[in-house]
């Protein structure tokens, strides 16, 4: 996430191992949060970064800070399922063409989530195209990109994210095929491990993202709790 924020020129703040993220616009659990928190003294230093506004803490379950955060008024606010797999090939078929994304990446991603194409995030997300360590893909219907996904590679590991599909092209196998392309790229790069995450099943029913991830060979490894700061 540090490099993703750097790509958009969005400042972050660090304290020890912890990293505070704060994207422009309304706060969201994904983009207004603290990562890598293992010491409450670091939280004391980072809270001021949010200027009294809302933020979340994505907590490593091994940090052992759950009870301390609850004592401070933080509340559990949905966990994320973390997944991991190797780089073995994953067969996937679609009538869409899968290829390298271009500067339309951000627009398609924004529209996939109902955001205005003029939002700040559009240019920010497109900034990862061609950036060191990033490998952005799209599914194309003719010449038009209709779905997105990216791989960020560091050392022998890769993170998969920025997945989105336009409503008009959901159910066409775009995300499974983009997942397969990113796995292939990871193998070409000599990576050994891939990680990703998504929301947990609601009422025991997994969402489309969860199902696509599992179908592509990822194994659930742990739940990462998110804690909302007191209002």
Model-derived features: where do they sit?
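A conserved beta-strand-loop-helix scaffold within acyl/acetyltransferase catalytic domains
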Residues: 116-168
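N-terminal charged segments
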Residues: 1-51
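Short amphipathic alpha-helix that is part of the acyltransferase structural core
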Residues: 32-41, 80, 89-123, 127, ...
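Conserved acetyl-CoA-binding loop-helix of GNAT-fold acetyltransferases
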Residues: 41-47, 162-165, 171-188, 211, ...
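A short helix-loop-beta-strand connector motif used in the catalytic cores of GNAT acetyltransferases and
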Residues: 4-16, 51-54, 77-80, 128-137, ...
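Conserved acetyl-CoA binding element of GNAT-fold acetyltransferases
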Residues: 27-38, 156-167, 226
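Acyl-donor-binding surface of acyltransferase catalytic domains
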Residues: 37-102, 196-197, 202, 206-214, ...
């Amino acid at each position: 996430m540090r490099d993703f924020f750097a790509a958009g020129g969005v400042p972050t703040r660090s304290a020890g191992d912890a990293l505070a993220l704060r994207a422009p616009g309304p706060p969201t659990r994904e983009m207004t949060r603290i990562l890598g928190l293992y010491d409450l003294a670091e939280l004391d230093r980072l809270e001021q970064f949010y200027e009294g506004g809302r933020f979340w803490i994505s907590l490593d379950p091994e940090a052992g800070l759950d009870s301390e955060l609850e004592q401070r008024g933080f509340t559990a606010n949905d966990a994320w399922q973390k997944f991991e797999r190797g780089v073995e090939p994953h067969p996937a078929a679609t009538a869409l063409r899968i290829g390298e994304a271009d500067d339309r990446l951000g627009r398609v991603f924004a529209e996939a989530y109902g955001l205005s194409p003029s939002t700040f995030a559009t240019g920010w997300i497109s900034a990862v195209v061609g950036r060191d360590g990033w490998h952005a893909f799209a599914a194309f219907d003719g010449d038009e990109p209709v779905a997105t996904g990216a791989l960020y590679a560091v050392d022998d590991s890769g993170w998969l994210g920025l997945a989105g599909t336009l409503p008009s092209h959901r159910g066409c196998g775009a995300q499974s095929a983009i997942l397969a392309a990113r796995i292939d790229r990871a193998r070409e790069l000599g990576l050994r491990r891939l990680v990703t995450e998504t929301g947990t099943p609601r009422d025991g029913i997994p969402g489309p993202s969860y199902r696509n991830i599992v179908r592509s060979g990822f194994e659930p490894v742990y739940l990462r709790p998110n804690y909302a700061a007191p209002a």
